[in-house]
Amino acid sequence: MINKQRLLDEFLELVQIDSATKDERKIADALLAKFRALGITAEEDDTGDKIQGTAGNLLAVMDGGKDAPALLFCAHMDRVEPGSGIKPQIKDGIISSDGTTILAADDVAGIAAILEGLRIVKERQIPHGRIEILFTVAEEGGLYGAKMLDASKLKAKAGFFLDAGGPVGTVVVQAPAQKNFRAVIHGKAAHAGVAPENGISAIVVAAQAIAKMNLGRIDQETTANIGLIRGGEATNIIPDRVELVGEARSRSSAKLEKQVEHMEEVIRRTCSDYGVSADIKVSDSYGAFSLNQNDFVVKLACQAAEAMGLEPRLESTGGGSDANIINGYGISSVVLGMGYDHVHTTSEVMPIDQLVAAAAYVVSIIENS
């Protein structure tokens, strides 16, 4: 059913188009041309202007005469670094880079699978209802494309995001919310050689606070991390300012609040012990979603997998994706496993048979809707 060579050629073509976060212009233009060739109406929004990027989200619609719920298929156009000048290699049915860059199967595999699926639907004249295709920008940079989207343009009742690890047939039905955490600790400067006793090191205070925090894997639903520390000016100055940047995630809103409160309390208590102060800011990054096997989108994903002879696997994840944002807009959405591995590393790989299966999965979802 799937034109394997055409799909492979398109994947190899797209991974070689540089598409860093907020610099997706080249791949956006290529995809707009592909939509035109397919006879599918597509438009680009103004997200690029809003986030100071070079391209916006692409939203395409393929209308059909079938009385069926509208479906949304989504993938993101950007990729992590090092993702420029990718030179794909094929060995024993596995696609990889030359080892100096990522492969960008995350998420070119999703884009290619969707496009091939649409071609098959057209070529075989498979009856379908309204199909919406969303290719977002700046997913890797903080889900900015999805956050800036005008959701009123989406009519879909179910969303399928081709952007997860695990073999094809994996259906991610739960993902955490994330809060961003930023604290600036204000110490007291002094000459480190002449009068260190007159200073209070903000770095020491920060180190003591971090050592007291519960971080990493808190429980099966909750994680926390301090990922950035910025501070100090010179070795001969007791540092009077340090910035800590971190996050907390959980599939439980109560646990998420508790973790963030714990991190804030530890910093304030430690600052109090040293007689210094801190400015702390907590902000929402994205919300959680949790679906079950009775939800239409999950039923359809499972039915489509079974029609292919696959055993659907319902999974939870600790990561966020555009699906978190779209679920927040009221469109029940799942994330589908693509079969790639070692994403965000120079060891990233994409088995060709999984790429073919992902495209077939798109067709099966449409057929079974």
Regions found by a protein language model. Give the residues of each.
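Short, low-order "capping/linker" segments at domain edges
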Residues: F289-A304
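Active-site metal-coordination/substrate-binding segment of hydrolases
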Residues: G53-T54, V61, D67-F135, S152, ...
